[in-house]
Swiss-Prot record:
The keyword rRNA processing does not apply. InterPro entries: KOW, Rib_uL2_dom2, Ribosomal_eS4, Ribosomal_eS4_C, Ribosomal_eS4_central_region, Ribosomal_eS4_central_sf, Ribosomal_eS4_KOW, Ribosomal_eS4_N. Belongs to the eukaryotic ribosomal protein eS4 family. It comes from the Eukaryota. Gene3D superfamilies: 2.30.30.30, 2.40.50.740, RNA-binding S4 domain (3.10.290.10). This is Small ribosomal subunit protein eS4. GO terms for biological process: translation.
Length: 263
């Protein structure tokens, strides 16, 4: 009988969006326990080795991390399997680079470079609000931060802007129709659009209808919606493609047009 935590992850069972091939080895890095779920995170080793190509092997990643070059959300992280996830800011002071982990329209984490100004804050979705001991109100975010004494107007599903240096809330966006959102789960993962309406289903999942910039509409569960801007102005810079998913035919036409213009 197995007792205790699982310590391994087979390569074939690793999340698809890590984009690991089957034949390079048997195992994949199992993310440490941390603020993001195993299937929704990107371990530091994969980000540095497979995405940025700053290292060739896991040992090299360890050497980079152990020199305390890598910061996530303003804190030095030396664990190579630390689970970085959606909206996390990864800073490498040595090269002066900052990245924000955001999904592209294919549902993978894009290498999205940001300015040092933008690296000072992050957006967090409010998961739950409760009153703790001695009547102190608390708020819990999607990346497991607990913040005391939040603004009483902030409700569940709203998005808060957090200053990474102090961990304080600087601003918030209500979950409301007409606001810009990103889908963080399900079949529409990575798409960005404006919330058009919300269907309430007590006892089941609330469904939210979203319309993207090209006028395509789609629906997803409320739990997959992450508000990223007021009106249609995003509060963060968006990766290439601006979260508009093209159909296969549109992608093909775009590829051919690019080929002709370069050829």
């Amino acid at each position: 009988m197995a007792r205790g935590p699982k310590k391994h992850l087979k390569r074939v069972a690793a999340p698809k969006h890590w984009m690991l091939d089957k034949l390079t080895g048997v195992f994949a890095p199992r993310p440490s326990t941390g603020p993001h779920k195993l299937r929704e995170c990107l371990p530091l080793i994969i980000f540095l080795r497979n995405r940025l190509k700053y290292a060739l092997t896991g040992d090299e990643v360890k050497k980079i991390c152990m020199q305390r070059f890598i910061k996530i959300d303003g804190k030095v992280r030396t664990d190579i399997t630390y689970p970085a996830g959606f909206m996390d800011v990864i800073s490498i002071d040595k090269t002066g680079e900052n990245f924000r982990l955001i999904y592209d329209t294919k549902g993978r984490f894009a290498v999205h470079r940001i300015t040092s100004e933008e690296a000072k804050y992050k957006l967090c979705k409010v998961r739950k609000i409760f009153v703790g001991t001695k009547g102190i109100p608390h708020l819990v975010t999607h990346d497991a931060r607990t913040i005391r004494y939040p603004d009483p107007l902030i409700k569940v599903n709203d998005t808060i802007q957090i200053d990474l240096e102090t961990g304080k809330i600087t601003d918030f966006i209500k979950f409301d129709t007409g606001n810009l959102c990103m889908v963080t789960g399900g079949a529409n993962l990575g798409r960005i659009g404006v919330i058009t309406n919300r269907e309430r289903h007590p006892g089941s999942f609330d469904v939210v209808h979203v319309k993207d910039a090209n006028g395509n509409s789609f629906a997803t569960r409320l739990s997959n919606i992450f508000v990223i801007g007021k009106g249609n102005k995003p509060w963060i810079s968006l990766p290439r493609g601006k979260g508009i998913r093209l159909t296969i035919a549109e992608e093909r036409d775009k590829r051919l047009a690019a080929k002709q213009s370069s050829g």
